[in-house]
């Protein structure tokens, strides 16, 4: 890793963060362990995470923060940039060894996205199970972050035992990881820290970034245009980003299975890529840890007015909806949910919601209706609204959905919040 380039790029990221009008609110920073090796698992909705999240996390932890990024991004100037900020390609043959080594030594924290790729439609639950939708199809969340954390702690505990019982094998292991001093390895613990990022509002429109890109290249792909319109608007128009840290998972507590403990203490030579006797037990532990951090990540979604309006509109069974009825239902929903304090809410929902029933002085209903009409989810602008049900249920092109039907995305985002869904129904 080029540390000079990392620091220089960090200055550029700081400037970009200042330039952006995004407002970032941090919640739960007390959940970040002050000591230990940290692996952050984060939901992935925009390129903003790839560009700015390492800088934000570095400012909170004072640690270099490296990340695992899709191999397709490592091309041209973007690839150089990603190298400089500590990103590692998913196809790097040494990626696992690099991650485990740096977690053993604590030289860097890591960011991994368990969905594997950006989830533009925010569809991550199907029939009560986590199932990620993407342009390439559907797949369960990856267990890679859990597996890497388990392998890190496996070797940490193994070194701790072998330095006393089989020092030659311990020294061989340290040499394999290119670690000169094992003392720093033994005193650390490995933690997975779940992180949720919620963006509000989600709006896509032409902006300075998309205009500039068109002037440079008038043959942009639809995918790039969509990303510039959606994420450029977020950065330049002032999106609220709630960054919420969940309870850290101490990985050492997940290695107590007798078969795993036997492998940890084995005096036989175990190379990094060797299959071990307890691999099935390790795999089961990885799946369990993945379920824990997925529950934590998506349980921390910060609910906002768009979530309530979109969810209520989707669940109302009638095609024709009176606007006053919709406002009353959302007012009661907000009052019930916030008072019971079962999930997290945007700061605008912490205040009195009476304006929804009176003059809509903060424009929450008006802004939602404008978006619904522009994207043809709703027709009519007076007392009776005509709902286009297909716009809230039918699938859309993965790389166009944030432009063509953001309300579908918004309602998908809160599907994992069972308490909210019960209140909506």
What are the language-model segments listed below?
Residues 1-66, 70-74, 80-83, 91-425:
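Membrane-interfacial terminal anchoring regions of lipid-handling membrane enzymes
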Residues 88:
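The substrate-binding groove and active-site-proximal loops of carbohydrate-active enzymes
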